[in-house]
Regions:
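N-terminal chloroplast transit peptides
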Residues: 1-38
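Predominantly flavin-linked oxidoreductase catalytic cores and closely associated redox partners
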Residues: 51-52, 76, 155-306, 315-321, ...
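Flavin-binding catalytic cores
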Residues: 280-311, 320-321, 328, 353, ...
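FAD-binding beta-loop-beta segment adjacent to the flavin cofactor pocket
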Residues: 312-335, 339, 387-392, 398-408, ...
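A conserved beta-strand/loop capping segment in the N-terminal third of enzymes
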Residues: 96-162, 166-167, 172-187
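Beta1/beta-strand and adjacent pyrophosphate-binding region of the FAD-binding site
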Residues: 45-65, 81
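C-terminal helical "tail/cap" subdomain of flavin- and related membrane-associated enzymes
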Residues: 26-30, 360-466
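Glycine-rich FAD pyrophosphate-binding loop
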Residues: 58-62, 71-93
């Protein structure tokens, strides 16, 4: 969340996609879909028309990507199955969602624990900069618990016709032609606690892999490996007077003590705070970095009690392969987590929905078989819309997270109100209006100046350490 601030100073002008979905809603408004909305696709296809049945699609994984995909498929007339291993899963996720996600995915306000309107970016030398000064009165960053958000999206998919299966996906048999079914093997639990479950199979026409960084669907299509970060998070119940401080405030800490290539965070939840960090390059030291994050925030969380400890891998870039035949990857399984900020919830849900829309469109609301060309439309649209964001944040991480002096420069630039305005336009709405050319030029000069000072400081520090 924090490092998206730098999108603006490298000239990134991410525009909202101008492509219109190839469907129309049969009732109510497209801008705010109700829970049981149905839509139809206008298309023509040469692929086989299905006889006496609908297209069958399985979504593996019930997080934001899987829930959004299953709901969209079910609304579009697809026979939809969603397989999720752990219905109460709690991921070590900061839980920040942009304002646009609340409206775009019609999320009820009661699943949002906190509306963050104040943010602090804290440098290695503990210089704190307020980075939410340009937020308008109605604007905020939502803080959610993943177990609450995920369960809500799965339930909404079920309400719209998806069959939600409590099961552990094991493997799939891949057909040799373009029309035979994929045979999925899984252990079904039927709400049982413990045990290995009952071995079952399911035949489907297409598969969406939304099963996270350790995706078995990705392995089944030989999607390749990627670098990943380890995220470590502790949920800490703190005294009421301390919790009042974090009521609408989030903190991000940068420094090689909390992470050599990421940041530490303190994010407010319903009645506790989430304190965490992550790293790609020094995974074995993650507990040391977590301890340092707690130490940096110690006065503000004093008297707190750890109520839950969570750890999970987070992808650092998209997989080499995200599609094969009638199988596509979305969310963390595809590698859709941004560098610097670690943002993934919105992009997971968005990719799940976009992939499902491509299937609904290609199948004419479940009436025809789909093929790889249909699913590839999702990838083409995704890459066109979001690829620049990932590339820019990759560069920014390499520039500003490489040393403590560079991190000091980063925090210094976050104090600029123009940076903050462009940041939150981009983060909250996933679109940025054209900037002010004079302000852009001034910002570029200030950025260069900050980096020059950072490099000079690093050289002096290196001399002292010899």
């Amino acid at each position: 969340m924090a490092s998206v601030a730098l999108k603006s100073f490298v000239g990134l002008r991410q525009q909202a996609s101008t492509e219109k979905p190839h469907y129309f809603f049969t009732s109510q408004s497209q801008t705010k879909p109700p829970g049981k909305l149905k839509f139809q696709v206008l298309a023509s296809k040469s692929s086989p028309r299905l006889t006496n049945r609908k297209l069958r699609v399985a979504v593996i994984g019930g997080g934001p990507a899987g829930g959004a995909a299953a709901e969209t498929l079910a609304k579009g007339g697809i026979e939809t199955y969603l397989i999720e291993r752990k219905m109460d899963n709690c991921k070590p996720c900061g839980g920040a969602i942009p304002l646009c996600m609340v409206g775009e995915f019609d999320l009820p306000l009661d699943i949002i624990d906190r509306r963050v309107t104040k943010m602090k970016m804290i440098s290695p030398s503990n210089v704190a900069v307020d980075i939410g000064q340009t937020l308008k009165p109605h604007e905020y960053i939502g803080m959610v618990r993943r177990e609450v958000l995920d369960a809500y999206l799965r339930e909404r998919a079920k309400t719209n016709g998806a069959e939600v299966i409590n099961g552990l996906f094991l493997k799939m048999d891949v057909p040799k032609d373009g029309v035979s079914p994929y045979v999925l093997h899984y252990n079904g639990f039927n709400g049982k606690v413990g045990g290995v479950g009952e071995k079952r199979t399911l035949e489907v026409d297409a598969v969406i892999g939304a099963d996270g960084a350790n995706s078995r669907v990705a392995k089944a299509i030989d999607a390749g490996d990627y670098d990943y970060a380890i995220a470590f998070q502790e949920r800490i119940k703190i005294p009421d007077d301390k919790m009042a401080y974090y009521e609408d405030l989030a903190e991000m800490y940068v420094g090689d003590d909390v992470s050599p290539d990421f940041y530490g965070w303190v994010f407010p939840k319903c009645d506790h705070v989430a304190v965490g960090t992550g790293t790609v390059t020094h995974k074995g030291d993650i507990k040391k970095f977590q301890l340092a994050t707690r130490k940096r925030a110690k006065d503000k969380i004093l008297g707190g009690k750890i109520i839950r400890v969570e750890a999970h891998p987070i992808p650092e870039h998209p997989r080499p392969r995200r599609l094969l035949g009638r199988v596509a990857l979305v969310g963390d399984a595809a590698g859709y987590v941004t560098k610097c900020s670690g943002e993934g919830i919105y992009f997971a849900a968005k990719s799940g929905r976009m992939c499902a829309e491509a299937i609904v469109e290609g199948s004419e609301n479940g009436k025809r078989m789909v093929d790889e060309r249909d699913l590839r439309k999702y990838l083409e649209k995704w890459d066109k819309t979001y690829w620049p964001t990932y590339k820019v944040l990759d560069v920014l991480q390499k520039v500003f997270y490489r040393s403590n002096p560079a991190r000091e420069a980063f925090v210094e630039m976050c104090a600029d109100e123009y940076v903050q305005k462009m940041t939150f336009d981009s983060y909250l709405y996933k679109t940025v209006a054209p900037g002010n050319p004079l302000q852009d030029l001034k910002l570029a000069v200030n950025t260069i100046g900050s980096l020059v000072r950072a490099n000079a400081l690093k050289k002096e520090m290196d001399k002292l350490s010899v």
